[in-house]
Amino acid sequence: MSRQINAATPSSSRRHRLSLSRRRINFTTSPEAQPSSSSRSQPSSSSRSHRRQERRQEQRVSEENVQIIGNVNEPLTRTYHRQGVTYYVHGQVNISNDDPLLSQEDDVILINSENVDRERFPDITAQQYQDNIASETAAQRALQRGLDLEAQLMNEIAPRSPTYSPSYSPNYVIPQSPDLFASPQSPQPQQQQQQQSEPEEEVEVSCNICFTTFKDTKNVNSSFVTSIHCNHAVCFKCYVKIIMDNSVYKCFCSATSSDCRVYNKHGYVEFMPINVTRNQDSIKQHWRELLENNTVNNHTTDLNYVEQLQKELSELRAKTSQVEHKMTMLNSDYIMLKHKHAVAELDLQKANYDLQESTKKSEELQSTVNNLQEQLRKQVAESQAKFSEFERSNSDLVSKLQTVMSRR
């Protein structure tokens, strides 16, 4: 059944939403009604079975004590409990000041030994009765969450039309837990100031599947996703790989679902994969677009470029070391050749000196030979003169001898 609520001004509606978000149910026990630990007794098996039957009956009755405020086709924004009736508010509803549900006082249930129903619970204490009421309230909320999950699974199993799109489907309602009191509005200024005052801390977290380390800002963003049925996180890369291989994500805790949640500082987003297409060229096209349009101020690209330059620098340093080694060897050869050249110059100077000495000696010998030849020529001339003179003397003597002989 739906309930009509009188309209109010925007300022009053915001004030009333804040008052609703602060509503709670407090269970208090009077001091005289609290028994000591020694006086508590364990209930018998018959009382436990009786309580289970009563709990099932109250669970069936609790389904009738539910009132819905607003349009049921809109998402559930808040829920609260008052005087045995659970109220579910759907969508943005302005509640007037005259509504009795807007009492600023909390719903306090005082439980003592006098107001416990002894006919239904003859052997139960006030504390156990209070725990039973809290358990029944938690069971009702768990039942509502189960119904929401069943509705979501039925929507997934139901056949879809070719034009189905979850982003624009008017019948797709995101299930929310009745325990969530916060509306999908922007955070209040006090919350924003508190978030701004918190220091940002970068934390390195690793994936339990691929062991890749990511650096995220604590309580601000996250590179991990979780299933809608558990809180075990994996990186988005591993989630996509599992969905690509199996079409369904199964956690190591046996929770199976294809939907996942992505978190940031404002909340989380639930999404589910619609279509899985296996095409190896799509990632290449995607990377071409990334390299063309998304690498202008990319720190990773700069790091890759710096790494490439460092590699080139290392290669150039190695080549420079080789050139320096060759230069050292050439300098050594040059010094050795220089020493050889100096030795050759010394040898040449010595040879030149020896040549000069030999030339000088040769000139002296030539002079001596010339002198000897001159002396020999003079001696030959003298000898020829003497021989001529001897020949004349001999001729004269022969002629004289012939003359003497002829006279005889």
Swiss-Prot record:
Biological process annotations from GO: regulation of viral transcription; symbiont-mediated perturbation of host ubiquitin-like protein modification
Which SUPFAM superfamilies does the protein's record reference?
A: RING/U-box
2 X 8 AA tandem repeats of Q-P-S-S-S-S-R-S: region residues = 34-49
Residue ranges annotated as compositionally biased, kind Low complexity, are 30-47, 183-197
Compositional bias, Basic residues, is annotated for 13-25
User: RING-type zinc fingers: which residues?
Assistant: 207-255
Reactions catalysed:
S-ubiquitinyl-[E2 ubiquitin-conjugating enzyme]-L-cysteine + [acceptor protein]-L-lysine = [E2 ubiquitin-conjugating enzyme]-L-cysteine + N(6)-ubiquitinyl-[acceptor protein]-L-lysine
Region annotation (Disordered) ranges: 1-67, 176-199
PTM summary from the entry reads: Auto-ubiquitinated.
Task: Provide the protein's localization.
Answer: Host nucleus
**Quaternary state and partners of this protein?**
Homooligomer.
What is the protein name given in its UniProt record?
A: E3 ubiquitin-protein ligase IE2
